[in-house]
Amino acid sequence: METISTIAALRERLAAYRRAGKSIGLVPTMGYLHAGHMELVSRARAENDIVVVSIFVNPLQFGANEDLAKYPRDLERDSAILRDGKVDFIFAPGVADMYPRPMETVVDVPKLGTELEGAVRPGHFAGVATVVTKLFNIVQPDSAYFGEKDYQQVAIIRRMVEDLAQPVRVVPVPTVRDADGLALSSRNVYLSTEQRAAAVIVPKALAEAERLYNEGADDPIAFEAALRDFIASEPFATPEVTAVRHPDTLEPLTNLQGQPILVALFVRIGATRLLDNRVVGRKQASSDKAA
């Protein structure tokens, strides 16, 4: 495994593999890796000759009052984890290498990017789309791997790839969860013991959503209100987004029954924002995995 910090060096190393016809898989991350990330790595390893994991805390996707400065960083720890995952390259650039000058060019998918999480984090998904495009340009992967926990992000990247004819296969990978159902996230480290116990309200709310749907709930406004009340019953929890949408377009629905629906939650536990989602009403069972 080799760790590379500059764009030029990574391009040079990958060019030889590309000339030899080797397939390249990219797992973009912001580091502080957990079992969810390693599920992405495992999928990439199974499907590609060469696996690149990028570790870059992207300032473009953080708002003015968000957690850029305190976002957990530990490259030594991450490197040890990735070595066990048989990764070929870690790409760990600095901000000055990725953004040597203030960015004048921004990639935006405005219709998808201003809904749901984008409504409470303006500019976030433009920052995501911009850095992912830049990583695609640098690595030129055949396939790129993203967690389904970030459902909206996957939808945006898929649309971006389609609209811009980027030659990359976008591969969504099922969410990995702790034993109590909480989706793994690098931000879970922010939670105190009490807050971590309270955070289980998020997966419980998804289970409640499935129960309501299976019992025939059809009015999206009442459905969303019921989920807000359910989450708010936990004193540590503040529901910021409780939404039901079309799972492909993310558009609002006028009724729920007779179709699969996306339930999207964005919940603040103390000062920490957690997001989660579930597609309800599809015939196949959930593909989420336990850690």
Swiss-Prot record:
Subcellular location, record wording: Cytoplasm
Binding site for (R)-pantoate: 61, 153
One GO location term (cellular component): cytosol
Chief location of this protein within or outside the cell: cytoplasm
Pathway field: Cofactor biosynthesis; (R)-pantothenate biosynthesis; (R)-pantothenate from (R)-pantoate and beta-alanine: step 1/1
Active site: 37 (proton donor)
Annotated catalysed reactions: (R)-pantoate + beta-alanine + ATP = (R)-pantothenate + AMP + diphosphate + H(+)
Residues annotated to bind beta-alanine: 61
CDD domains in alphabetical order: PanC
Entry's EC annotation: 6.3.2.1
GO molecular function annotation: ATP binding; pantoate-beta-alanine ligase activity
Keyword Cell division: no
InterPro entries in UniProt: Cyt_trans-like, Pantoate_ligase, Pantoate_ligase_C, Rossmann-like_a/b/a_fold
One family name in Pfam for this protein: Pantoate_ligase
Top enzyme category: ligase
Keyword Cell membrane among UniProt keywords: no
Function of the protein: Catalyzes the condensation of pantoate with beta-alanine in an ATP-dependent reaction via a pantoyl-adenylate intermediate.
Assembly description: Homodimer.
Annotated family: Belongs to the pantothenate synthetase family.
Note: The reaction proceeds by a bi uni uni bi ping pong mechanism.
Record-linked NCBIfam families: cyt_tran_rel (TIGR00125), panC (TIGR00018)
Protein name as annotated: Pantothenate synthetase
Chain's gene name: panC
